[in-house]
Amino acid sequence: MGCIKSKENKSPAIKYTPENPTEPVNTSAGHYGVEHATAATTSSTKGASANFNSLSMTPFGGSSGVTPFGGASSSFSVVPSSYPTSLTGGVTIFVALYDYEARTTEDLSFKKGERFQIINNTEGDWWEARSIATGKNGYIPSNYVAPADSIQAEEWYFGKMGRKDAERLLLNPGNQRGIFLVRESETTKGAYSLSIRDWDEVRGDNVKHYKIRKLDNGGYYITTRAQFDTLQKLVKHYTEHADGLCHKLTTVCPTVKPQTQGLAKDAWEIPRESLRLEVKLGQGCFGEVWMGTWNGTTKVAIKTLKPGTMMPEAFLQEAQIMKKLRHDKLVPLYAVVSEEPIYIVTEFMSKGILLDFLKEGDGKYLKLPQLVDMAAQIADGMAYIERMNYIHRDLRAANILVGENLVCKIADFGLARLIEDNEYTARQGAKFPIKWTAPEAALYGRFTIKSDVWSFGILQTELVTKGRVPYPGMVNREVLEQVERGYRMPCPQGCPESLHELMNLCWKKDPDERPTFEYIQSFLEDYFTATEPQYQPGENL
């Protein structure tokens, strides 16, 4: 997949604005009003978009989908993106949120709950710290610690997390009614949301969201008749009594260790000898993908490129851009071997390529709610790329990776414009993914975020057909001719017409009439409440 600086987004001719009424919290003595605010689009990377200049990239990999297999599960940082960098005026003690095994001789191993004095936190994502328990100095991943005795250090605090991601976690198999988490409110600055797993006869398993409001004097409440000095006291109260909630709080929602930002301190350009290729996962036009180990300690995915695929100098420059793109739904780039044969090291994902997962893995048995949720996750990642003014250029199931609990991440970005292969750069050559490409991009090379939207419509057909090749029975040239004449794929068997209507919006001839990824994400996240509330499982979907 390629991410490039895109043209300025124009307002579409059709305005896609879902209604987002936010119901006020009921402060009566009975059951509390549940927060029904529509999930806002959230990004794991905050702040202004980086200006990486105008780039022109082509997608990596061709039709066979040579993609790195990224991480075993989604990670949500429960720590703010940064803490105050000054350590003067008193020492702040930090506490470990997770266990960590050292990957290099410069790292510190530690256990959850261990306390640290931070020596230097001004050099990025890895901080120099001293363990109070052992007295040892070393580097620690900054997103594995939080200030001791802070809200961020509480096990139930999940920080910046959207409503939909909270629901995904709480509804994971094995979780029981009453399991909960606290997160920042998406709709009210300075407020929090309490998300609880519930069950009822009508909806079955579901999640209720309650807004935790802040008093002027610093206290907290869900209803004004029950106010608390601290968030910790509020949580403790509702673990003892439901007191108007749908259920009393039982246990904290399980989470997983977040991915570290990079493999270790200054581990970016790494020696080839530090990597061990162990299991070949796939191959394609331009290289192979392996599961392997870095430094004898860390499981990774390794993409090996055939010599001559791209210039090493250009690749290294591009990789500097790739590693700056950070989002929960993008596979992170960890490190590179920049001399030929080029190696690209990324997060390892346990379930592999989405296309294979749908055709040969457990994905064969998924029903429409799971498939729509996977599409919503992909739209979430693409909405981030949209906000960053980049484009993907090769969005399809072969470039999406799957982890535990059906977590999906977008892979393979930033490389394609560097590929030196006539069968690819010709756009209509054998290695170019014509069936996924918008006509203006295939015919005239006009790649924009709106051509990505077209590709997303095709990807939706891959999901609901469990990996069927688009335009069955048609060869590439025929597809291009028919699409130019106005042909669009019919509604796949078992697919609701409302979902097919979204596909057709993505396939509008005029790129400006196609929806934004922000709209697509919102539509898919609320699909079974706003669009198809009467859905009943069928034979295949």
UniProtKB/Swiss-Prot annotation:
InterPro entries: Kinase-like_dom_sf (IPR011009), Non-receptor_tyrosine_kinases (IPR050198), Prot_kinase_dom (IPR000719), Protein_kinase_ATP_BS (IPR017441), Ser-Thr/Tyr_kinase_cat_dom (IPR001245), SH2 (IPR000980), SH2_dom_sf (IPR036860), SH3-like_dom_sf (IPR036028). A lipid is attached at residue 3 (S-palmitoyl cysteine). The modification Phosphotyrosine is found at residues 32, 334, 343, 424, 535. Coiled coil: none annotated. It is found in: Cell membrane; Cytoplasm, Cytoskeleton, Microtubule organizing center, Centrosome; Cytoplasm, Cytosol; Cell junction. The active site is at residue 394. One of its GO terms (molecular function) is signaling receptor binding. PROSITE patterns: PROTEIN_KINASE_ATP (PS00107), PROTEIN_KINASE_DOM (PS50011), PROTEIN_KINASE_TYR (PS00109), SH2 (PS50001), SH3 (PS50002). Interacts with YAP1 and CSF1R. Interacts with FASLG. Interacts with CTNND1; this interaction allows YES1-mediated activation of FYN and FER and subsequent phosphorylation of CTNND1. Interacts with IL6ST/gp130. Interacts with SCRIB, when YES1 is in a closed conformation; the interaction facilitates YES1 autophosphorylation. It catalyses: L-tyrosyl-[protein] + ATP = O-phospho-L-tyrosyl-[protein] + ADP + H(+). Its EC number is 2.7.10.2. Residues 89-150 form the SH3 domain. Keywords: ATP-binding, Cell junction, Cell membrane, Cytoplasm, Cytoskeleton, Kinase, Lipoprotein, Membrane, Myristate, Nucleotide-binding, Palmitate, Phosphoprotein, SH2 domain, SH3 domain, Transferase, Tyrosine-protein kinase. Residues 1-29 are annotated as: Disordered. Residues 1-10 have a biased composition (Basic and acidic residues). GO terms for biological process: cell differentiation; cell surface receptor protein tyrosine kinase signaling pathway; cellular response to platelet-derived growth factor stimulus; cellular response to retinoic acid; cellular response to transforming growth factor beta stimulus; positive regulation of transcription by RNA polymerase II; regulation of D-glucose transmembrane transport. GO terms for cellular component: actin filament; anchoring junction; cell junction; centrosome; cytoplasm; cytosol; glutamatergic synapse; Golgi apparatus. Phosphorylated. Phosphorylation by CSK on the C-terminal tail maintains the enzyme in an inactive state. Autophosphorylation at Tyr-424 maintains enzyme activity by blocking CSK-mediated inhibition. Palmitoylation at Cys-3 promotes membrane localization. Its main location: membrane. Residues 19-29 have a biased composition (Polar residues). ATP binds at residues 281-289, 303. It is an enzyme of class 2 (transferase). Residues 156-253 form the SH2 domain. It comes from Rattus norvegicus. This is Tyrosine-protein kinase Yes. Non-receptor protein tyrosine kinase that is involved in the regulation of cell growth and survival, apoptosis, cell-cell adhesion, cytoskeleton remodeling, and differentiation. Stimulation by receptor tyrosine kinases (RTKs) including EGFR, PDGFR, CSF1R and FGFR leads to recruitment of YES1 to the phosphorylated receptor, and activation and phosphorylation of downstream substrates. Upon EGFR activation, promotes the phosphorylation of PARD3 to favor epithelial tight junction assembly. Residues 275-528 form the Protein kinase domain.
